[in-house]
């Protein structure tokens, strides 16, 4: 009798272990990260490739899992209830009498076996598979491939019926594994929150992706701020301009910015003046040809142009061939570096925890990051916070004009001609 009980317990343990393997396979083979598996496969392990192959045809894998789970459950219930109930009844008969003992023993045996299967054949293995999907998947993929071979006729039968059902109702069974920019942002965000990525690395990655979305006008020096020399300037006018506004390169024009002849390296010009040389601003040996780019290019495209041409300075023109600004390699790279570098003049200055002073030329991306605003209305129509104010007010803003958007109030506090210089942003209570 003891040997029979031992054999029964051994059979139940074997069934629980079998069910645990299948349950863990059900979770682990469906959840491993494709990139992680490919990385493991590149190290020479063939098991990740087997997992990837199973993921390409999930129907057959799911079918064999369900066949095995149901077989084990039926066997476990039958063996457990019929084999254990006599022993439980014998224990009850030692203390009690009555016709209720047999059905009670069967119920106790059923509950006991069910609890064992739920705990050790389902919950624990699935929790382990969720926590270590790649490790568990690599451990069980061989067993599952063997099971699919053994039950191939049944797998084919059930999988065919399921496919007919899907085709009948036009349900796609193709798994979409395409990586989008949103997926990458989510992974980066999760890495930053988990501490895998440092704060600086987080900013760098986000800013690199911003380069494709942002146009060159978001970081250019605008037309009214361009420092230039006219070809007719005297030596004193040139020296006064250079002493007032020091830049490594300076634009040479012919009667205004809309006729740019090229640019000159400031240090070369100053060196020639210090050596008392006769300087002609239009001298071909001194004047360099400027790179002109349309204002529709993204920062990434401008960076590629700088790379291909060897230039680090470009003139930006609009569709009417009017100069709207200039951009340098340093301007583009400052977008990548973001908050890792300190600008001489910050676009956004925090007055206190509930208010900020913002330069009118601040790109929307900077405002959304600092104020944690998800998006601005119709933001494809403008690129700066000044453009947002004009769009919302539907007029040229003047002092004290304000806009309430979300939980913030945007108020114009300084203008110059038609340009917004500064905006005061304050936190307001949301209207109920």
Curated annotation (Swiss-Prot):
Residues 1-201 form the CNNM transmembrane domain. GO terms for cellular component: plasma membrane. Involved in cadaverine and putrescine tolerance in stationary phase. May facilitate the efflux of both cadaverine and putrescine from the cytoplasm, reducing potentially toxic levels under certain stress conditions. SUPFAM superfamilies: CBS-domain pair, FAD-binding/transporter-associated domain-like. The keyword Cell membrane applies. InterPro entries: CBS_dom (IPR000644), CBS_dom_sf (IPR046342), CNNM (IPR002550), FAD-bd_PCMH-like_sf (IPR036318), FAD-bd_PCMH_sub2 (IPR016169), Ion_transp-like_CBS (IPR044751), Transptr-assoc_dom (IPR005170). It holds the Pfam family CBS. GO terms for molecular function: flavin adenine dinucleotide binding. It is found in: Cell inner membrane. This is Polyamine export protein. It is a multi-pass membrane protein. The keyword Transport applies. It comes from Haemophilus influenzae (strain ATCC 51907 / DSM 11121 / KW20 / Rd). PANTHER family: HEMOLYSIN-RELATED, POLYAMINE EXPORT PROTEIN. Keywords: CBS domain, Cell inner membrane, Cell membrane, Membrane, Repeat, Transmembrane, Transmembrane helix, Transport. Belongs to the UPF0053 family. PaeA subfamily. The chain crosses the membrane at residues 2-22, 61-81, 100-120, 138-158. Its main location: membrane. The lineage of its organism: Bacteria, Pseudomonadati, Pseudomonadota, Gammaproteobacteria, Pasteurellales. Residues 220-279, 286-345 form the CBS domain.
């Amino acid at each position: 009798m003891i040997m029979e009980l031992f054999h029964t317990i051994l059979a139940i343990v074997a069934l629980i272990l079998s069910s645990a393997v299948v349950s863990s396979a059900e979770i682990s083979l469906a959840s491993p990260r494709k990139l992680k598996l490919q990385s493991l496969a590149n190290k020479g392990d063939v098991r990740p490739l087997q997992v990837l192959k199973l993921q390409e045809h999930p129907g057959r894998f799911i079918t064999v899992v369900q066949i095995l789970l149901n077989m084990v459950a039926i066997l476990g219930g039958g063996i457990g209830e019929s084999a254990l109930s006599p022993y439980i009844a014998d224990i009850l008969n030692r203390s009690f009498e009555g016709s209720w003992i047999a059905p009670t023993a069967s119920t106790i045996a059923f509950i006991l076996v069910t609890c064992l299967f739920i705990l050790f054949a389902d919950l624990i293995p699935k929790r382990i598979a969720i926590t270590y999907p790649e490790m568990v998947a690599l451990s069980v993929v061989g067993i599952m491939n063997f099971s699919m071979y053994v039950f191939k006729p049944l797998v084919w039968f059930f999988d065919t019926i399921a496919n007919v059902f899907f085709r009948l109702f036009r349900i796609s069974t193709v798994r979409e594994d395409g990586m989008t920019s949103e997926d990458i942002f989510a992974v980066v965000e999760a890495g930053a929150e988990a501490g895998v990525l440092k704060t600086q690395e987080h900013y760098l990655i986000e800013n690199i992706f911003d380069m494709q979305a942002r146009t060159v006008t978001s970081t250019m020096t605008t037309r009214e701020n361009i420092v230039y020399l006219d070809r007719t300037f005297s030596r004193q006018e040139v020296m006064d301009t250079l002493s007032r506004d020091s830049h490594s390169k300076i634009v040479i024009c012919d009667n205004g910015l809309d006729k740019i002849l090229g640019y000159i390296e400031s240090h070369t010009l100053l060196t020639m003046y210090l050596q008392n040389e006769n300087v002609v601003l239009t001298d071909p040996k001194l004047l360099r040809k400027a790179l002109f780019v349309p204002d529709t290019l993204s920062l990434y495209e401008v960076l590629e142009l700088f790379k291909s041409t060897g230039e680090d300075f470009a003139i930006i023109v609009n569709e009417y061939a009017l100069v709207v600004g200039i951009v340098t390699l340093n301007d583009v790279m400052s977008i990548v570096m973001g908050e890792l570098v300190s600008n001489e003049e910050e676009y956004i200055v925090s007055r206190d925890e509930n208010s900020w002073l913002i330069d009118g030329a601040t790109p929307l991306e900077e405002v959304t990051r600092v104020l944690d605003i998800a998006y601005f209305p119709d933001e494809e129509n403008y690129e700066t916070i000044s453009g947002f104010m004009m769009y919302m007010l539907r007029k040229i803003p003047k002092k004290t004009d304000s806009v309430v958007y979300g939980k913030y109030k945007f108020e114009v506090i300084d203008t110059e001609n038609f340009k917004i210089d500064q905006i005061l942003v304050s936190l307001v209570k949301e209207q109920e």
